[in-house]
């Protein structure tokens, strides 16, 4: 919700303070048509990754059908933000594997690796390196050591946009 606020959507700080409160614009799971800037309702953890992969596939299909040498109409990047709990779900793993297989270079996944899930530390249910898992899926993987380094994040996003061979995974 912070990103939506900073991007200028109608999401004032008062709404952010009402996070997870009944009738707020900031429910526990983002909801399409309830929160400005939310393009789909992701529902259970991991589903947002599947939604993003679907959007990236749709973008590729639209580009193949409508783009010409004179007019590149569809050239957008799909960006998904995911946490530890999201990437522990099977739907996220399956969708990410497909994204790597299809070399969806219009997809960037930003992973907030704070080692916290909804009700426990991530190591209570996960022991593998998520970074290495996404490398195995075929992603271009970038590690940002300091999540407060905005220039490093901007540089990683620019690198993701510039490469045209595979999806990008940015661990923050």
Language-model segments: residues:
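Cofactor-binding active-site loop characterized by glycine-rich and histidine/acidic residues
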Residues: 1-101
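Conserved thiamine diphosphate
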Residues: 67-74, 115-117, 121-159
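Short glycine-/polar-rich loops that comprise or flank the Walker A/P-loop
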Residues: 76, 104-107, 137
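Cofactor-binding loop segments of dinucleotide-utilizing enzymes, especially the Rossmann-like FAD-
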Residues: 83, 111-114
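A short alpha/beta connector and helix-capping loop motif
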Residues: 89-112, 169-171
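Anion (oxyanion) recognition and catalysis
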Residues: 101-103, 135, 164
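Terminal amphipathic helices with adjacent charged low-complexity linkers/tails
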Residues: 161, 167-172
């Amino acid at each position: 919700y912070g990103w939506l606020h900073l991007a200028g959507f109608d999401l004032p700080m008062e709404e952010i303070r009402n996070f997870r409160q009944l009738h707020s614009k900031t429910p526990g799971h983002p909801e399409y048509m309830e929160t400005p800037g939310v393009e789909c309702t992701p529902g259970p953890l991991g589903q947002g990754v599947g939604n993003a992969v679907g959007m990236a596939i749709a973008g590729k299909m639209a580009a193949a059908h409508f783009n010409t040498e004179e007019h590149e109409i569809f050239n957008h990047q799909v960006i998904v933000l995911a946490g530890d709990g999201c990437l522990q779900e099977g739907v996220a793993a399956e969708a990410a594997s497909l994204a790597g297989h299809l070399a969806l270079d219009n997809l960037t996944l930003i992973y907030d690796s704070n080692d916290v899930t909804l009700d426990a530390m991530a190591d209570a249910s996960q022991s593998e390196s998520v970074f290495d898992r996404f490398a195995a899926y075929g992603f271009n993987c970038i590690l940002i050591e300091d999540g407060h380094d905005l220039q490093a994040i901007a540089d990683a996003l620019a690198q993701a946009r510039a490469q045209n061979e595979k999806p990008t995974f940015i661990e923050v």
